């Protein structure tokens, strides 16, 4: 049993966490009790902490369902345009606290749970993260769902219910080891299975042409079982749906291949079909080309399009003709957003349904498809672009291959007519890439089949137009747009940093939570002594709390008055965790050289997962942990420098570390990070940014003033110029003694005395084939870090910059991003009228 709390400690739990909301404490207690006994069939003598969490989850869920049902009824009655957000990743994190925040139930639940002798925060920690994403792309989808619900859009997230999400990361002897993420082991109280909407998905087979049309025959069928998760808007009684598909084998699966006695084998082989939704592919910004992954991509698209068309056909105003559905109005009623190229098969699949099944003629079907679909590009790295072998399509999706060939032929005919004789342009713009292995370029398919293509930050959209899709931009410039990414301020401020949220509410009220641009009202208060004191105090409390967490979780003691220098994101060469490592080694060498000098104490925290097959990324983790082993145990260094690798970085850990950070590292090579969203979370939570002019950093500097960030390094133009000249890492190595010393130490085994050769391949890469030019930015980076130290010595000036950054972060709300998508791409207006709460009559 936990030791009894003092009265003072108890009262701390009754603080205004977030804002006053609805909910009656007695009712919450009653509901909790009922669920513990009737849903979980436990009494207090045998109930575990997890039972208490589940009882609370069911209690909170009860407050959702009335609003959920009411929202769907309202959509049926009003028949607004539906938005379908298709993504292979939704990185949702935990649901309990977010639901309490959005329904305004947090205070009632906190008090009720306290009265029952339990601790709300302890119960929240029991929930598993829904880790159905790798990083930024999946988390963006989750933020977008929150914003679409908060804006009252009739939106649906569609994806896959992976049985195993992103792996859990363990660090063993400094190396990453992956463990399966069995997140559904104890059940998921937030989802509702919908077997009545199960749908068939076809694979393999052959194509038959006849006078009646084209048929796809002799296919293998897998069933798609939908699981619905509610997505509540912020205090607006709207609850949208995220529908995730799970693969099920049909009951007759393989039983028609019945050889004598083959029954058991056939039943065991059901696993093969059900493997489609077994596991999330753990690659971020890297294309692997596995058949199972292509199956996943078609699986989600085929099930979702059937569902969309079913809903369109049964909608009040969707189809006027009683005999046969008219698809004329389809693009007026349906918008499909493709989150990267992963759901690109929506384009040929919609064509297949319209042409083969609904008998719409090709030209009309193509017009409908283009008007319906829009594509978001998320990366410029060539190794990330999806290029599937034609041979794989031929086997797995023969009809779709035919359709893609036909789409490509018409497209190339159009280009040839506009640019006669320009054969190279045809080659560059084709969906089919010729060569030893013919491939399908999914990005080209998306651009051709969509009415809008957007990048995710201004600089990225410019690169998309001028480089990645240059030829396509020349063909249809009006198609290309920018939609700078954003984050939901509900999860990324109110939920994770209630102290800061409360400090802001005291100054400007709470409207900023649904209109983040109102943070501008803090600008006149940048010099306000009381605000400076409060903001600094909240940050210090967050640091103390995170320090306690680190000690409990990892057994590491850190100095909470040191600068918390945080670099958390997927481990990838382009994100340049190696540049951070070189700075840490340089700081270490400076302390060792002159231990008496005044030194700003730093705790450097690096966290993130490496793709299991990405050797260099795994080496980078080993390097960070090895540097930590030496630095953290050096008595001369003492408390002045600590290096910590944050194991198993995920949404729930981000919610703890981001509010505690002083410095946010956003140091990708200019022109490689499409946008980034971690940068925005740190800005909103009162950290200052050290970064390159890349992704959304550019717009952050524009909003807050470049002098309020620590900007360093090559710009995109400089990187291009250096590429033309030829990047020579040896020049920097030979001319910068501190860089040379650091590199030599890493190379010689100074940080890996038991394996002196451990990092030779890393150094070899840095010196001889570093695509991301780490050494070229080293000098500017180290100088910029010295400016960081300089400002940190003056806490008041530091905090003024923090307040200015917070005040200027309003642009980076996903509410603003989604409002722009709705206006410029989807042609959907957020409704003027709110959904009435379940307690009121429907209209």
UniProtKB/Swiss-Prot annotation:
Pyridoxal 5'-phosphate binds at residue 569. The modification Phosphoserine is found at residue 15. Residues 677-678 are annotated as: Pyridoxal 5'-phosphate. The modification N6-(pyridoxal phosphate)lysine is found at residue 681. InterPro entries: Glycg_phsphrylas, Glyco_trans_35, Pyridoxal_P_attach_site. GO terms for biological process: glycogen catabolic process. It comes from the Eukaryota. Activity of phosphorylase is controlled both by allosteric means (through the non-covalent binding of metabolites) and by covalent modification. Thus AMP allosterically activates, whereas ATP, ADP, and glucose-6-phosphate allosterically inhibit, phosphorylase B. The modification Phosphotyrosine is found at residues 197, 473. The record marks 156 as: May be involved in allosteric control. It is an enzyme of class 2 (transferase). Its EC number is 2.4.1.1. One of its GO terms (cellular component) is cytoplasm. It catalyses: [(1->4)-alpha-D-glucosyl](n) + phosphate = [(1->4)-alpha-D-glucosyl](n-1) + alpha-D-glucose 1-phosphate. The modification N-acetylalanine is found at residue 2. AMP binds at residues 43, 197, 310. The record marks 76 as: Participates in a stacking interaction with the adenine ring of AMP. Glycogen phosphorylase that regulates glycogen mobilization. Phosphorylase is an important allosteric enzyme in carbohydrate metabolism. Enzymes from different sources differ in their regulatory mechanisms and in their natural substrates. However, all known phosphorylases share catalytic and structural properties. Homodimer. Dimers associate into a tetramer to form the enzymatically active phosphorylase A. Belongs to the glycogen phosphorylase family. This is Glycogen phosphorylase, brain form. It comes from Ovis aries (Sheep).
